[in-house]
């Protein structure tokens, strides 16, 4: 059976919601590499609601830190408007600081994979 979580939250109190989500949906990440991928569509401010809010990213990073992973990587590869402009996109959105030093440019290690689709024969993804 599928489960969802609906929890009242604000960006100021999102840490409680993140903690609750990890309680309801436990993850075994001890000694594993964890990639946290915020949604970075383009350079914008948090108030524009175009990217993952920095306070939410920070809450997730801090929760994952407590779970003893072998490695944490925070990254995305902003598409269309700012494709390949990762560092500037993370800086402008406030996500670089929220990543707490775990940021990695996922656009630096691209690879092409076959993609069985009516629309695309292949797709580019990060090796990370």
Where are these regions (language model features)?
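N-terminal and secondary-structure boundary signal
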Residues: 1-128
